[in-house]
Amino acid sequence: RAHFLPPLLLL
């Protein structure tokens, strides 16, 4: 959700 988090968490 947060954009500051690394893309790996989005996966």
Swiss-Prot record:
GO cellular component terms given for this protein: extracellular region
Tissue/organ expression: Expressed by the venom gland.
Chief place where the protein resides: secreted
Keyword Secreted (UniProt): yes
Protein's cellular compartments: Secreted
Keywords tagged on the record: Antimicrobial, Secreted
Protein name in UniProt: U1-poneritoxin-Dq2c
